[in-house]
């Protein structure tokens, strides 16, 4: 007896007008995640996942490409306004914000959420090259 054909349900994209872009800029890579106001991830991209490897991952251009790819991934949600949360000291901090602005989003707020210890863990020793 043949099974009845299974219909694939078309996933309905919810419409979100305001979003939050979380930018994690480390010295080695840049991760861009766009969420709704509640923190549910809508799309993400990384410099490494955008085709950059090794030391090219940690460039401002790689961060810009990652931000463009992330913006492309969430454009179906209808986001118009973005709040940007930047974390980390990496080279991709500024270029991601510029790329998100150029992608057509209206940036309403930029917040630096880099964690700063109140004299917590001992930092790693200095590099000797």
Swiss-Prot record:
Of the GO CC terms on this record, one is: ribosome
For this protein, the record's InterPro entries field holds: Ribosomal_uS11, Ribosomal_uS11_bac-type, Ribosomal_uS11_CS, Ribosomal_uS11_sf
Record's keyword terms, sorted: Ribonucleoprotein, Ribosomal protein, RNA-binding, rRNA-binding
SUPFAM superfamilies attached to this UniProt entry: Translational machinery components
Q: Which NCBIfam families match?
A: PRK05309.1, uS11_bact
Q: Which family does it belong to?
A: Belongs to the universal ribosomal protein uS11 family.
Cross-referenced PANTHER family: 40S RIBOSOMAL PROTEIN S14/30S RIBOSOMAL PROTEIN S11
Q: What assembly does the database describe for this protein?
A: Part of the 30S ribosomal subunit. Interacts with proteins S7 and S18. Binds to IF-3.
List the HAMAP family hit by this protein, alphabetically: Ribosomal_uS11
Q: Please give the name of this protein.
A: Small ribosomal subunit protein uS11
Specify the species.
Erwinia tasmaniensis (strain DSM 17950 / CFBP 7177 / CIP 109463 / NCPPB 4357 / Et1/99)
């Amino acid at each position: 007896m043949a099974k009845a054909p299974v219909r694939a349900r078309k996933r309905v994209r919810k419409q979100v007008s305001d979003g939050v872009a979380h930018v994690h800029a480390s010295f080695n890579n840049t991760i861009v995640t766009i969420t709704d106001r509640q923190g549910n991830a809508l799309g993400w991209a990384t410099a490494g996942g955008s085709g950059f490897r090794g030391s090219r991952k940690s460039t401002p251009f790689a961060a810009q490409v990652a931000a463009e790819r992330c913006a492309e991934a969430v454009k179906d949600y209808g986001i118009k306004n973005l709040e940007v949360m930047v974390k980390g000291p990496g080279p991709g901090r500024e270029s991601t914000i510029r790329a998100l602005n150029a992608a057509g989003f209206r940036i309403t707020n930029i917040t630096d959420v880099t964690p700063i210890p109140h004299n917590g863990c001992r930092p790693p020793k200095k590099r000797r090259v």
